Structure formats: C-alpha cells, structure tokens
UniProtKB/Swiss-Prot annotation:
Gene from which this protein is expressed: LRK10L-2.8
Alphabetized InterPro entries for the sequence: Kinase-like_dom_sf, LRK10/LRL21-25-like, Prot_kinase_dom, Protein_kinase_ATP_BS, Ser-Thr/Tyr_kinase_cat_dom, Ser/Thr_kinase_AS, WAK_assoc_C, WAK_GUB
Membrane topology, Cytoplasmic segments: 518-892
Subcellular location: Membrane
Species this protein is from: Arabidopsis thaliana
Name of this chain's protein: LEAF RUST 10 DISEASE-RESISTANCE LOCUS RECEPTOR-LIKE PROTEIN KINASE-like 2.8
Length: 892
C-alpha cells in the first residue's frame, strides 16, 4: 500500500487532514486512500461509498460499507443492518435487504420501522412501503392476516378496517407487484420478497464529482459537503476545497423549472436534491413512487399541481383511502408560514376514529357525517371546530372528542366540503380529500421573476433570495441620455437645491408636529398586522375561542375557586349549554408573545386520549390568558389518598387509576407527534371523573407563563418535592429526560399503595432543612414488611396478612413497578411503554429491582447542578413544556 512509503511526518499530516476535514496540504500519495476501491465478495464500490481501505472522508457519512467474515456487504441505516445485494454506480442504485428479516418472518427477533434518510436515499418507483400491524385482536377478522407466536395476529392490509385494534406496527419495503390483499397472507411469498430486498436510489448531486474528476482530482466529503482534492505541487502538496456553485450556476439552475414524479414545471419554494439553493428548506420533495411529495411532521402531502403563485396539495395517506393506518394531524401551517398561506376557501375537515358510540346516537346535523371506518364508528365534521356555525352542535362535538380514540384535522377545499354537506356520501367525501387544498406563495418571488431574477433561498440570511444573471436584475438605464442633457440636469439640480433650502424650515416644523402622529399610525398598523396574524393562527386551532368577557361570564366573575397552582387559579364555570367546565386563568402575561401562547395551545389541543384532560377552548386577549377544559367532579387523586381523606379506595380501584395514569403518560411520551414531558406528576395533577377514570392534567402550561428570572433558584426547579427525579437536582444521577416522569410516576404509585409515609418524610425534612433526601427509607420499610403480604390500611401504612390473593397480587405488582420506576439512575428505569406492559402483564414476569445507591445532595448546589444536567440532556426529540414549574411543598 501507499502508506508504507510515507514519512512519519507525512502520515501524521495526512491523518490530521482526514480527521479535521479542512482545506489541507498533505502528500500526493495520500490521494491513494480515496483511489482504492471497497471490495467484498461480489460487491465493488468507490465514491460516494467508504469503508474498508476507503477512509471516512472518501464517502458520504451515511454510506459506510462493512464486510463480514462471510464476505457479505452490509450497510447500517438508523442502527438497522441491511445486506447490500447489489450496487449499480451507473444508475446510482442499491439493492438492500433487512438482515433481521431474511429467515422465517415469525422468528425475527425485532420488528422495528427503519426510515430511509430522505437526504441520501429515495425508494425506487418499482417498490412500495407496506405497514405490518401486529398484536391485533384475535377475536376480529382481518384481511391478509397471519398468526405468529411473537407477533400474535398480524395483518398487512393497507385499508385496514380495524386499525386501532392492533397494538403495534412497523413497515417493510416490497415490490409494487406484491399485493397482500387475500384473506389469508401467503407468508412464503412475503419471505421471498423480503429476502430479495428492495431498490433505493442515491440522492447525491453528481455534478461536483464530475467537475472534480475533469481536473484529475479525487472526489471526497467534508462532512456532508462534497469536496475536491487536487495535487498542488510535484513534491506532494494536496488541497481539498469544498464544492460551491457559482452565482451564474445558481441563477441558471434556479431559473429553470424542474420535474418530480408526475409533476412538471415546478419552481420555488419546492425543490429536490441538487436544487438546494432554489427552494425553501421546508419544501424538499420526495419524487419516489411517481409522485411529488413533501414531508411535514411525519405526514406526507402530495403536490397535485403548481402554477406560479398557487400550489395545490393533498394528504397522501387520504388519497383514495378514508381509513389509512395510524393517521396523524400535521401542524404544517407553522412550517409553511411565512412562505405559504392558506387561501380563503380552505376549511379544516376533522375526522374522528374509534368512537365508542353508534351513529344512531348522533342527532341529525348537516356538518357531521359518518366516515365508514371501524364498523361505522367513525365520523367527520366539515367545518373548522371553532366556527360559529357549530355553536349549536357543541354537545355532539364534545361527545366526539371525549369518546373517540383519535381525531385528525385535514385541510380541504371549502366548495368541496359544501358539496359534501348538501350531498353527504362516501364518494363526495373521497372527492373532497382527493381534491386537496390550495396555498398561496406569499414571498417576493413574483417581483423577483418580473425583474429577470430567479427565486431561491439564501443560506446566509436564512431567507428568500433573488438570484440574477451577472449579479444584476431589473432594467438597464441608458447612460447616453444623461450625457446629452447634462447642462439641463445640472441647472435643474441647482434650482431644486435652492427650493429645498427655502422649504427646509417649514418642513422641519411640520415633521416635529407630525412625528407623534406617525408613530401612533405605525404602531397601529404594526399592531393591526400582528392581530391579523394571530387571528389567522387562532383560526387553525380546533378549539372554541372565548373573549375575556365570556370567560368572566362563565365563571360568574371568578367567584368559585376549585384549585390553585403555580401557573394560576382554577375556577368552575358553566357554558351556555349548562355543561360544567374548569377555567384556569394564567398568571399575568404582560410582555409575553401571544403567538407563542397560540402555538402552545395548538400543540396541546392536538392531544386526544381517554387519560388526558380534554381542552375545550382558550382565551387570548391582550395579556389575558385562560384555558378552558373539561370539569371532573371528583377532583384530584390527592383527596382520595391523603391522610385526611374520608373515602378509602380498594386496591383494585387504585390499580385501575395507576394503570390509567401510566397509559396517559405513555401517550404523552410516544403517542404525540413531538414527545411531551410533564415534569410535575403528582396526585394533585391526576383528576378523576365520575367513574374514577384518571386524567393527567396541567401538562404544557408552564411554557405559557412568563419566565420571571433567567436563572432558576431551588424554588423554581421543575417538579414537586417528594416526586422530583434525582437527576433534576444533580447531574450525578444522569441527564434530564422523559425518564424523569417515570420516577415521579413511581413515587405516585408507591404513595397510592401506602408505601410512602407522610410522617417519615416530615421527619427527614425537619431533621436537616438544608438537604434533600430521596426516599431510600422505602426500602427499609419493605425490608421490615413482607412484600407478599402488603395491605393498605386506613392510615396508608403497610401491615401483614389478612388480604385476598387477588389484592395481594395487585399490591405486589404495584410495589415492584413503583420500585423499578424510582431507580436513581434514569437508564435503570423502564420507559413508560414498558411500565404499561409491566402493569398489564403477569406478576411472575416481574423481578425485584436492585436497591438504588442514593446520595445526600446539598440544597445550595441544586441550582447549578440542575442547569448542568439540563444542558446535557438530549432534548432534540423532546418538547419540554414545563419550563417554569414551581417546586411546591406537597402534603405527602
């Protein structure tokens, strides 16, 4: 190899250039690192791949090839191993097969969905993705189904009638000719298709490497940016320069329209790989499958047509299918603004799935119809839920929201929805979804094109860019005119200055007098513009908008207080239909951004779960903020498990409440588009309805309140003493994450079964007020008591014997789950989906967790350590709502 002949200095210098990825100087022989090919079995590859003898800068970071002992080439995508069946570098395609699905489908050890990174891979048009639903209800009948020991009953039908009766799902890629729609799935055909694999196309701009090769350079990568390395001197100097498009090249590329799938003549803000400068980052197109699609918040929208300033889109999963698997509501409006805005004719069609009542229970209503999924237990509403036209239907809408498992809002054409209202049938509903909705380009693109420029995106300013030929746009002025009339122009200018001088005094006086008026007008215009924007955002939220006067009226001038918290006061209220509501009036919000409040309420409004408190409306009027949500007559769990409670709940009821809270937290962590971490789970934030069904409340409110200080003190730390996770206090225990909610849940469960004693906590608090003790005394109590004989007594303590075997099993299960959840290290705690599985599963499957090693933390260091732990936490996939919760002294 080349490196044997290199001097030590050259080797070190070249390695330095490899690892730092900078324009570098190295040995000319160093180019051999990228000239060598990757070879394994019958696979040979060069740029843009790397691996083996080809070092990392020689290829794209995501295209590392591996060769195992059997000479099989593999590639890892999102930690999933794929075998490389074939590489065709002429067409830039690969054939891949998942290594875990090469054998018997039922014996696979993992069933995970691996998403192909769209920035580098594009599924070939001759292949498609299918969803496999598993752990389905064996009592129901499914199309294209099979039963495996590990999967239970599973189905591959793409128009599943009972999609919500299956607990899990994952996707596989198969040829478009594969149709699993028969009654019983032919597993042999499926296994054969998976073994053959699927084809993907590499999404890499070929021009930079072609230009580099024309200069006898070596193609390489500086991170994800293509570079070209060339020898600069006979003595061996090498220079690696990142590729940059010239201004003329950008203008040429962006002034031309492009095609994607079946769509032609596409332009800004849409773009595809190779045209990054020509479109907005949020509008990258996926051209696989023969369609032009954009992905917003994990939801695909298909481009139906585009003409200059208008673009028509439709939800891809709803085209031709009213019952897609696991549909989501995409908060795409925030992504589109300010590049695109909805046209005035667009309405939001809301679809409800998995409802617990029949259509006969819904009174006749022109705005509400039957969807036709889930054996008829699914419905649609043809108007924005905030529309005044639906005021007379609030009772029906409340039932839909509370008794349906999922609701999805889909933009649709107003005229199409009007046709659906006048002639409600499945064909018109499909037509309304298939026709999509229109959006208007709001940027300066039309002006740019009119001046001869090409529309694009300026990476430096992160905004709209107008690219011009030779750097000039607009009309060219005729300099000859000025030469011919130079004397006349000079005279005109001289007399103009004289006239201006005479008027200067008068102008100054008028300006002084008019400035205050101008300031008022500008302020009013700006305020009007902001209000219009807020009104547009409000209109997109499927909740009732209340004025402050209406809030005051429904609460009878805020007379009946039902609760107080760190964010505001809760009042009971009554709507016009006599239904009871709870109204939380947030603390003074002067100086805060109303748009932030609207965006947060929008996120909160998209949660829909039986164990999550339902939001009914909101008020955003100046600095006044209020949240209106369902009223739960039984109040909080705290009054049922506190020492002062006169009502004792049996263990079965407590178990049902604990399981419901776990399911609610699982939904917040995994069921929402963006993970929601509560950070303040405690009995006061668990509300109970008339049937003692628990509902988690007060999530998302902290971000809606003003942050008073830049550095949080101990009393400003998220959570409540006694429930707060150790890592929230000190980084010694790990990073802050969704596992902090798991800890709080564990403490809640232990309190519910009486494993926590208020007097013990009070003693610890009084013994050393300057320190925070985590409850290791729980284990001491459990050592004294026999776990298998736990019983909840009247005062919440632990005694032995005298309980039924069923209650004994419940107590043991809740104790073990609680102890697993309060492990001091976040990595030792189970995630909430595992907690639900443990609570629902067999007691025999649970092991006694290890006793955590807990340390005494000085309160004086809490503030600094808290911030350190937060900064180190992985927050990229977490929407941290509780940013300013008060650390309250709870009565435990």
């Amino acid at each position: 190899m080349y490196y044997h002949s290199l001097s030590s200095y050259s080797i070190l210098f070249f390695l330095f250039s490899l690892f730092h990825h900078l324009p570098c100087a190295s040995s000319n022989q160093g180019l051999g690192w990228c000239e060598s090919l990757f070879q394994c079995g019958n696979i040979t590859a060069d740029f843009p791949f790397w691996g083996g003898n080809r070092h990392k800068p020689c290829g794209h970071p995501l295209l590392e090839l591996h060769c195992n002992n059997n000479n099989i080439t593999s590639l890892y995508i999102s930690n999933q191993e794929f075998y490389v069946r074939q590489i065709n570098q002429t067409s830039n395609t690969l054939t891949l097969a998942r290594s875990d699905l090469l054998g018997s489908f039922c014996s696979s050890y993992a069933y995970n969905t691996t998403t192909l990174p769209p920035e580098i891979f594009e599924l070939s048009p001759t292949y498609k993705s299918l969803t496999v639903l598993y752990h389905c209800d064996p009592k129901l009948s499914y199309r294209s189904s099979y039963t495996c020991p590990a999967l239970g009953t599973f189905s591959m039908s793409q128009s599943v009638d009972y999609q919500y009766s299956c607990q899990n799902s994952f996707t596989v890629n198969v040829p478009t000719s594969f149709h699993p729609e028969e009654r019983g799935l032919n597993l042999t055909n499926l296994e054969s298709a998976l073994r053959k694999g699927f084809e993907v196309k590499l999404v890499i701009d070929e021009i930079p490497c072609q230009q580099c090769s024309s200069t006898r350079g070596i193609c390489s990568f500086n991170g994800t940016t293509q570079s070209c390395c060339n020898a600069t001197s006979p003595s061996g100097g090498v220079s690696c320069v990142p590729y940059q498009h010239s201004a003329d090249e950008v203008y040429r590329r962006c002034s031309e329209s492009f095609s994607c799938g079946s769509q032609r003549d596409l332009n800004y803000p849409l773009w595809k790989p190779g045209r990054e400068e020509c479109g907005h980052p949020n509008f990258k197109l996926n051209c696989s499958g023969g369609f032009a699609e954009i992905n917003i918040a994990s939801v695909k929208f298909r481009i139906l047509d585009s003409y200059r300033s208008l673009i028509r889109l439709a939800r891809s999963d709803y085209i031709g299918d009213l019952c897609p698997a696991n549909p989501l509501t995409a908060p795409f409006i925030e992504k589109f603004l300010p590049v695109l805005e909805l046209t005035g004719e667009t309405e939001l069609l809301t679809l409800y799935y998995g409802c617990r009542f029949n259509s006969s229970d819904i009174p006749a209503n022109i705005y509400v119809g039957e969807l036709g999924c889930d054996e008829g237990r699914s419905y649609y509403v043809t108007r924005n839920l905030s529309s005044p036209l639906l005021d007379s239907s609030r009772g029906v809408l409340n039932n839909l929201r509370e008794m349906c498992k999922r609701n999805v809002s889909v933009p649709a054409s107003g005229p199409a929805l009007f046709d659906l209202q006048t002639r409600p049938n499945q064909d018109n509903l499909k037509m309304a979804l298939d026709q999509g909705f229109r959006m208007l380009i709001t940027s300066d693109c039309e002006r740019c094109r009119g001046s001869g420029g090409a529309c694009g995106y300026n990476q430096t300013s992160s905004g709209f860019g107008c690219y011009c030929k030779d750097g000039k746009c607009g009309y060219e002025y005729d300099d000859g005119f000025f030469r011919r009339h130079r004397r006349f122009i000079a005279t005109l200018v001289r007399y103009t200055f004289i006239a201006l001088g005479a008027l200067t005094g008068v102008v100054i006086v008028f300006l002084v007098l008019l400035c205050p008026c101008f300031r008022v007008q500008i302020f009013r215009k700006r305020k009007t513009s902001d209000e219009v924007r807020l009104q547009k955002l409000k209109a997109l939220i499927p909740l009732k908008h209340y004025t402050y006067a209406e809030v005051k009226k429904m609460t009878k001038s805020f007379t009946e207080v039902v609760g107080r918290g760190g964010f505001g006061i809760v009042y009971s209220g009554t709507l016009s239909d006599s239904s009871m509501v709870a109204v939380k009036v947030l603390k003074d919000s002067k100086g805060t951004d109303g748009e932030d409040f609207i965006n947060e309420v929008a996120s909160m409004s998209q949660t829909s779960h039986v164990n999550i408190v339902s939001l009914l409306g909101f008020c955003c009027e100046g600095s006044r903020r209020a949240i209106i949500y369902e009223f739960l007559g039984n109040g909080s769990l705290d009054k049922f498990i506190s020492d002062k409670s006169s009502v004792n709940l049996d263990l079965k009821t407590l178990y049902g409440i604990a399981l419901g809270v776990a399911r609610g937290l699982e939904y917040l962590h995994y069921g929402c588009k963006t993970r929601i971490v509560h950070f303040d789970i405690k009995p006061q934030n668990v509300l109970l309805d008339d049937n003692l069904c628990p509902k988690v409340s007060d999530f998302g409110l902290a971000k809606l309140c003003e942050k008073k200080e830049s550095i949080l003190s101990l009393l400003d730390t998220r959570g409540t003493i006694g429930y707060i996770a150790p890592e929230m206090i000190s980084r010694l225990y790990g990073s802050v994450s969704h596992k902090s909610d798991v800890y709080s849940y564990g403490m809640l469960v232990l309190e519910m079964i009486g494993a926590r004693k208020k007097e013990r906590f009070d003693q610890n608090s009084r013994s050393d007020g300057s320190s925070i003790y985590f409850p290791e005394w729980i284990y001491k109590d459990l050592e004294k008591a026999n776990i298998k004989d736990i019983e909840k007594t009247e005062n919440g303590g632990l005694i032995e014997n005298g309980i039924s075997s069923e209650e004994e099993e419940i107590a043991r299960k809740m104790t073990l789950v609680g102890l697993w959840c309060i492990q001091s290290s976040p990595s030792d705690r189970p995630p909430m989906n595992k907690v639900v599985e443990m609570m629902e599963g067999s007691l025999d499957a649970l092991e006694v967790p290890p006793r955590p090693v807990l340390q005494q933390i000085s309160a004086s260091s809490v503030s600094d350590s808290f911030w350190n732990s937060e900064e180190s936490s992985s927050a990229s996939d977490i929407l941290v709502f509780s940013t300013n919760s008060k650390l309250e002294s709870s009565s435990l």
